[in-house]
């Protein structure tokens, strides 16, 4: 899994891959801002397997912390709804 992550970072550097953050939708063009987030955090029983990983920008990954992907998306959706009202 680590080898695949390094390969993805290399493709970002070369401009051949521009992943989107799963959470905020931001295009990740800087390899230093690219992370693979655990949808179910390791601290909550998640594993480092492809089915439990998703691209995320550094900000979202750090802010998400120990939340699951679904929990963090609920937080983001709540914030968006509060901004509209």
Segment roles from a protein language model:
Residues 1-23:
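Short, charged surface segments at domain edges that flank catalytic/cofactor-binding sites
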Residues 44-63:
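Short beta-strand-alpha-helix junction that forms the catalytic/metal-binding core
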Residues 35-41:
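Histidine-centered catalytic micro-motifs used for acid/base chemistry in nuclease
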Residues 1-8, 27, 76-85:
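A boundary/linker detector
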Residues 15-16, 31, 48-52:
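Flanking scaffold residues of small Cys/His-coordinated metal-binding clusters
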Residues 19, 34, 55:
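Cys/His-enriched microdomains
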Residues 30-31, 63-67:
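Short, non-ligating residues that shape and space the ligands of small metal-coordination modules
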Residues 23-24, 59:
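Short, cysteine/histidine-rich loop/knuckle motifs that typically chelate Zn2+
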């Amino acid at each position: 899994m680590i080898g695949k992550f390094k390969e993805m970072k290399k493709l970002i550097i070369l401009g051949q891959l521009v992943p989107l953050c799963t959470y905020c939708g931001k295009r990740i063009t800087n390899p230093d801002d690219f992370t693979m987030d655990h949808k179910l955090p390791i601290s909550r029983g998640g594993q480092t397997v492809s089915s439990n990983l998703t691209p995320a920008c550094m900000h979202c990954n750090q802010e998400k912390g120990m939340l699951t992907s679904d929990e963090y998306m609920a937080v983001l959706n709540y914030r968006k709804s509060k901004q509209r009202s």
